[in-house]
Amino acid sequence: MTLLKSLCVFFFLLAISFTFTQAARFDITNNCPYTVWPAALPTGGGQQLTQGQTWSLDVPAGTTSGRIWGRTGCNFDGSGRGSCSTGDCGGVLQCKLSGAPPTTLAEFSLNQFNNLDFYDLSVIDGFNVPMQLSPTSGGCTTLTCLADKCPDAYLFPDDNTKTHSCPSGTNYRLVFCP
């Protein structure tokens, strides 16, 4: 019975350790002198951030094809329906669709090949808000895009030099108007 109990405890701790080392937190801060409504897929939906506010978004382990972008010029009613001048996602505050161009995108896939997170910035869909994406540990590369056609971002789909990696379990900071 002791062996069975020990094995159960071991596998429980292993499962918890595996989950926590792969999940990531994205702290999204608006430093712009205007309101930004960040949106996140496939988790997170959307939120309003005035200058200086931060939204902490916990992204589950194994998330692939994640996107975060800023929306501008938004107006929503009490039920979360409305529209945005840039980055609109079907007229709702809590996005379930990608944003309409132009959108500066932060893209990520967590715990992929060799236990790495992959991340990038993209202006393929256009540029709307200056953005910086920085891993908070691991000595990984910080990406900054202050204007259209910025050198740190994807400009065309097959630009394989723009994807970066960091060990799984890394947390990230995304800043609008860094």
Regions found by a protein language model. Name each.
Residues 2-178:
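Extracellular low-complexity, O-glycosylation-prone Ser/Thr/Pro/Gly-rich "stalks"
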